[in-house]
Amino acid sequence: MNNFILLEEQLIKKSQQKRRTSPSNFKVRFFVLTKASLAYFEDRHGKKRTLKGSIELSRIKCVEIVKSDISIPCHYKYPFQVVHDNYLLYVFAPDRESRQRWVLALKEETRNNNSLVPKYHPNFWMDGKWRCCSQLEKLATGCAQYDPTKNASKKPLPPTPEDNRRPLWEPEETVVIALYDYQTNDPQELALRRNEEYCLLDSSEIHWWRVQDRNGHEGYVPSSYLVEKSPNNLETYEWYNKSISRDKAEKLLLDTGKEGAFMVRDSRTAGTYTVSVFTKAVVSENNPCIKHYHIKETNDNPKRYYVAEKYVFDSIPLLINYHQHNGGGLVTRLRYPVCFGRQKAPVTAGLRYGKWVIDPSELTFVQEIGSGQFGLVHLGYWLNKDKVAIKTIREGAMSEEDFIEEAEVMMKLSHPKLVQLYGVCLEQAPICLVFEFMEHGCLSDYLRTQRGLFAAETLLGMCLDVCEGMAYLEEACVIHRDLAARNCLVGENQVIKVSDFGMTRFVLDDQYTSSTGTKFPVKWASPEVFSFSRYSSKSDVWSFGVLMWEVFSEGKIPYENRSNSEVVEDISTGFRLYKPRLASTHVYQIMNHCWKERPEDRPAFSRLLRQLAEIAESGL
């Protein structure tokens, strides 16, 4: 009876890494579930199956699906976990139904075990910590309640003959909420309605997720339009601003002029938050101010939250709700939520799912707005509705074959502080590159035309924007090679985005690519670049220091009247740019750290981002 086979199927397992030196790999195995054990075999064609491992069902402590937003590194994308003894087995099923069958069957057979855990970890153990709760011990107590009876003894109903769509979502499935509307006529995609809930079916692609609506319709949608439904996820609330500097927060609140206008924003310490509120009560009616309150956490498990010690709450939304109705120790009641950037949907990685080659007939050219290394830039529209920037590539200006090989990869680089490449037109000469349109043009021109109007805090915010984009490229192992204010663009609300990353690889003009060429940007180049053409993320850091200098000098040319050869000689003898008038001592110190002689002595962009955020939060 104990050998009766309940389920059998080919699945993929991740190594359990029972020893510290064990490799982390994935193996295809033939799994067999009986009343006594869960066994897995190596299944080689034409040969007898070889038993590779077996777990007694009586030793199982937990069986549950794994909810995660990471890209699954094997071709089966539906993970579940089997916790037994002191080990953790991750198994990957080919589809949702297969995973459901295995989890239900295993739960049914183990729900009366004596060793079941009260709590489990719903996300992966990766890189030395739990992704769900950031605990650093692999055997740490879980962070979510485990219910061994949930869905056990319950089989999903088959679809009715006239309706083959999926049934409504199972409780274990990840539910996401749309932050924005999304309209589409593409049969592969699904339209989104703001604040509606959807079931996440597949998140293996970073920028486009497959979801299901409440009517059972499925399709791909931009992942940046969605947020996971969770009591502690703040992104669905109109008062939350994820990435905004203290200076920008103060400007927005002052612009409202309303007593009690407020927002919740990320603090400089990851995972902590600040409430910023406008008031006229502290100083005078004619001299209002912004008060900042750090949201503090108790040492309880689970944590609780407070601003004033007398009023402690189980979640941040509950805390905000209370203070919207009661002052409770704050200078004023939280009356008017202020949100930055939520009115406009974020750009997507590609104009449509899987679409990176654009038909020229879909583009309308409106007017020429500039020229660059590759050719002319036009304002235009895609399908007469989406405003875009169209770069027409001059014949002989770039290595087109090399670029086309890289274009699809470059399109997948997507971040709020990068100018998005939407696609390319290849069907006619010259080829065109279609980019996100940025309202106010390049940063260097913007700084010069507005010179004398900038506060130092605003300039620091510009540097922070660029640093955010560069930290993303650094993590993605992408080298810009030509970072400068001329290659950053200014959008609405003075948001700065990095443009033309990696494009110099495709330039054919030797005067631009050779360090001896008259067009080579020596004034932004590190010593190892102009001496040996050695590009790296650390050579980008040097260029970022020069860009900071450009920003705080409001668009001046670095080294001003010096020739390229004189600049090379100056830098080689230890000369560095002077401190701009608007740069504080702390800001200038960061510039000098970027200009260290040896690349390894320069900070990473991730570190620069933390340092600049600290200065922005504490004041220049």
UniProtKB/Swiss-Prot annotation:
Induction: Through a myriad of surface receptors including the TCR/CD3 signaling complex, coreceptors, or chemokine receptors.
Catalyzed reactions: L-tyrosyl-[protein] + ATP = O-phospho-L-tyrosyl-[protein] + ADP + H(+)
UniProt: Zn(2+) binding residues: H121, C132, C133, C143
Binding residues for ATP: I369, G370, S371, G372, Q373, F374, G375, L376, V377, K391
Note on cofactor: Binds 1 zinc ion per subunit.
InterPro entries: ITK_PTKc, ITK_SH3, Kinase-like_dom_sf, Non-receptor_tyrosine_kinases, PH-like_dom_sf, PH_domain, Prot_kinase_dom, Protein_kinase_ATP_BS
Reported impact of P288G: Complete loss of interaction with PPIA/CYPA
Localization per Swiss-Prot or TrEMBL: Cytoplasm; Nucleus
Cofactor(s) required, per the database record: Zn(2+)
Effect of R451Q: In a gastric adenocarcinoma sample; somatic mutation
Domain of life from the UniProt record: Eukaryota
Residues where Phosphotyrosine is found: Y180, Y512
Alphabetical list of Gene3D superfamilies matching this protein: Pleckstrin-homology domain (PH domain)/Phosphotyrosine-binding domain (PTB) (2.30.29.30), SH2 domain (3.30.505.10), SH3 Domains (2.30.30.40), Transferase(Phosphotransferase) domain 1 (1.10.510.10)
Organs and tissues of expression: T-cell lines and natural killer cell lines.
PTM characteristics: Phosphorylated at Tyr-512 in the activation loop of the kinase domain by LCK. Subsequent autophosphorylation at Tyr-180 leads to the kinase activation. The autophosphorylated Tyr-180 lies within the substrate binding sequence of the SH3 domain.
Alphabetic keyword roster: Adaptive immunity, ATP-binding, Cytoplasm, Disease variant, Immunity, Kinase, Metal-binding, Nucleotide-binding, Nucleus, Phosphoprotein, SH2 domain, SH3 domain, Transferase, Tyrosine-protein kinase, Ubl conjugation, Zinc, Zinc-finger
Disease: Lymphoproliferative syndrome 1: A rare immunodeficiency characterized by extreme susceptibility to infection with Epstein-Barr virus (EBV). Inadequate immune response to EBV can have a fatal outcome. Clinical features include splenomegaly, lymphadenopathy, anemia, thrombocytopenia, pancytopenia, recurrent infections. There is an increased risk for lymphoma.
PANTHER family for this protein: TYROSINE-PROTEIN KINASE
Protein name, as recorded: Tyrosine-protein kinase ITK/TSK
Biological classification of the source: Eukaryota, Metazoa, Chordata, Craniata, Vertebrata
